[in-house]
């Protein structure tokens, strides 16, 4: 028996000694393969380019503003004006008790007179405070973005400086673009990029306060990125949203006001068709609202209209029905202030103004009405917790029991 084990050992011995050498060789081959394979930096470069583009492009979504740039209702509006800087802090995977406690802390801050009820006036004050937080956040971001497009640090950004940075974010060589602009040579860009550039330039003109010099200060650049910060740019934003895609001259904004008499490129859409789903960044190209009869005001059918023949199934029909229902409610209860069935430029501008105190009071009443189960025109802790999804975007379970826990 002993001799048999010795014989086996003598036969397997060379192979056992070979194992470490094989493993070493395999590791070396894998390392060489990894080294020879070209590193995939394209996704990294793409993410960096997208980040740069997003930083210098006016955003399609503005926190605390009722409409998106494409004319959609802002679905997150109520959470934005209720949570302010805490927006995004109530994800559903967060520990529920901690989220409920955080919500009750907010409740106590809104409830100024500590009667454990939130009145419309208290909610109005809170909405204005949270909107101011979004304004401050936008100002801080704009300062950072301004420095990115003001390479010489002279406190002014020219249209050409901005154009170079924008095209560089789209993948063009910054040096080649700068040289072409300096030599007044034609730039070769695709049709969509050209259309975005034309819209941006028109917006640049509008943000350039008189006397017009095509140079934006830091304050003007803020208005360029965030039109809600400027009365004139808010008016321009309304015009962009309701402009008829097929008719560049059909807009709800009416005649240009002082300082708007500048000649900029036209911004006509390629067709009058209203598209169902905009592509990313298309707030600068397409509009969702259309003044279909060109009378420079919006009727209810115009505000709720959707393209005919685009519903493919029952789910799509349900989406359309919800679209019409939501927009009809918004039109009748909030936008059409004199209830004559017509929305004028002034009414829409007032509705879009995030710092309008009258609007904030109306919104406060609307928000209370959603959760006011006992119909006392106030919000109580149980109601806020039960309707937590409306206020925070997250559904917090066991709301009734948690009231006693948190208080």
UniProtKB/Swiss-Prot annotation:
GO terms for biological process: calcium-ion regulated exocytosis. Glycans are attached at residue 40. InterPro entries: CAB45_EFh, EF-hand-dom_pair, EF_Hand_1_Ca_BS, EF_hand_dom. Ca(2+) 3 binds at residues 291, 293, 295, 297, 302. It is found in: Golgi apparatus lumen. Pfam families: EF-hand_5, EF-hand_7. The modification Phosphothreonine is found at residues 193, 217, 310, 344. The keyword NADP does not apply. May regulate calcium-dependent activities in the endoplasmic reticulum lumen or post-ER compartment. This is 45 kDa calcium-binding protein. The gene is SDF4.
């Amino acid at each position: 028996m002993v001799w048999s084990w010795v014989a086996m050992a003598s036969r397997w011995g060379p192979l056992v000694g070979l194992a470490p050498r094989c493993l070493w060789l395999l590791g070396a081959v894998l390392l060489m393969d990894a080294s020879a394979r070209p590193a995939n930096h394209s996704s990294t470069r793409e993410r960096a380019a997208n980040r740069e583009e997003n930083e210098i492009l006016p955003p399609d979504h503005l926190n605390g503003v009722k409409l998106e740039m494409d004319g959609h209702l802002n679905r997150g509006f109520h959470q934005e004006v209720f949570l302010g800087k805490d927006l995004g802090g109530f994800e559903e995977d967060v520990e529920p008790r901690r989220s409920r406690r955080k919500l009750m802390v907010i409740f106590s801050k809104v409830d100024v007179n500590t009667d454990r009820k939130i009145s419309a006036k208290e909610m109005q004050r809170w909405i204005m405070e949270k909107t101011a937080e979004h304004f401050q956040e936008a100002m801080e971001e704009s300062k950072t973005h301004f420095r990115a497009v003001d390479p010489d640090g002279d406190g002014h950004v020219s249209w050409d400086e901005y154009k170079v940075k924008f095209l560089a974010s789209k993948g063009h060589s910054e040096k080649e673009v700068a040289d072409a602009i300096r030599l007044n040579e034609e730039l070769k860009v695709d049709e969509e990029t050209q259309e975005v550039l034309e819209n941006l330039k028109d917006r640049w003109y509008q943000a350039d306060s008189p006397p017009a010099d095509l140079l934006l200060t830091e304050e003007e650049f803020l208005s360029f990125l965030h039109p809600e910060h400027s009365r004139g740019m808010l008016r321009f934003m309304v015009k962009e949203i309701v402009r008829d895609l097929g008719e560049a001259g059909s807009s709800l904004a009416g005649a240009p006001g002082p300082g708007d008499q500048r000649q900029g490129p036209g911004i006509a859409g390629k067709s009058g068709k209203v598209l169902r789903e905009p592509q990313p960044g298309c707030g600068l190209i397409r509009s969702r609202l259309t003044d279909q009869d060109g009378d420079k005001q919006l009727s209810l059918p115009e505000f709720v209209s959707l393209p005919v023949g685009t519903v493919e199934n029952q789910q799509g029909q349900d989406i359309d029905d919800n679209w019409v229902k939501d927009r009809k409610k918004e039109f009748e209860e909030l936008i059409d202030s004199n209830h004559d069935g017509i929305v004028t430029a002034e009414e829409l501008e007032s509705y879009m103004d995030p710092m309008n105190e009258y609007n904030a009071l109306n919104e406060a009443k609307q928000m209370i009405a959603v959760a006011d189960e006992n119909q006392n025109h106030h919000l109580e802790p149980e109601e806020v917790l039960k309707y937590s999804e409306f206020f925070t975007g997250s559904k917090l379970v066991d709301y009734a029991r948690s009231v006693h826990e948190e208080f």
